[in-house]
């Protein structure tokens, strides 16, 4: 593992200790280049979440049961292209869209550290809220108006592999996966650790 990642996860203190501190104030809140530079750096907890999510997906893909599924998919008609598109959407969704949105939430709606009890309650509330939001968005995606945004995900209906979990269109990822977290954070104002734990549990 590279030294920047080690520094992000360990550094002079543990990553847990980092999440247990207040969200640092952005040095230049009005600068878009500075915002995106931080969003795509390991100073952003969302970038760490991105790396962990992709790493876990890769590990799951390497399990014996998953490998056989991938082989079956690659042997099917159009399978190699579909799998490549699924991998691409995983990187676009988790690695391109995710970090800036996470950084925005942390800058705007994250509270100072909570007590342990409040954190448990907050994680539960965020997960429940996200589940409701995802359910409503998913129902909407199955209407004639929005099915175009959901169609790609259903191309994995014969062979389901771990990468298919986040193999959704950019529009679906924004509306069904991310928007419920953004709205939940804006309404509930979680602390840094609660947000990270809720997102981690929900995407796992």
Q: What name fits each language-model region?
A:
Residues 1-193:
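Non-catalytic, topology-defining segments of multipass membrane proteins
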Residues 189-204:
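Functionally important transmembrane alpha-helices
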């Amino acid at each position: 593992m590279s030294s920047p990642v080690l520094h992000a996860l360990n550094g002079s203190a543990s990553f847990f200790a980092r999440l247990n501190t207040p969200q640092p104030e952005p040095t230049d809140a009005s600068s878009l280049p500075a915002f995106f530079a931080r969003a795509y750096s390991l100073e952003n907890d969302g970038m760490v979440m991105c790396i962990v999510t992709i790493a876990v997906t890769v590990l799951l893909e390497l399990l014996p049961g998953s490998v056989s599924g991938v082989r079956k998919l690659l042997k099917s008609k159009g399978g190699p292209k579909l799998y490549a598109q699924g991998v691409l959407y995983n990187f676009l969704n988790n690695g391109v869209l995710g970090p800036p949105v996470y950084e925005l939430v942390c800058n705007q709606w994250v509270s100072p550290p909570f007590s342990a009890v409040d954190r448990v309650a907050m994680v539960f509330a965020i997960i429940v809220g996200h589940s409701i939001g995802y359910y409503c968005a998913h129902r909407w995606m199955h209407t004639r108006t929005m099915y175009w945004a959901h169609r790609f995900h259903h191309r994995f209906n014969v062979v389901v592999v771990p990468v298919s979990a986040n193999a959704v269109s950019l529009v679906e990822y924004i509306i069904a996966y991310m928007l419920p977290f953004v709205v939940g954070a804006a309404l509930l104002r979680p602390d840094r650790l609660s947000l990270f734990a809720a997102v981690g549990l929900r995407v796992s």
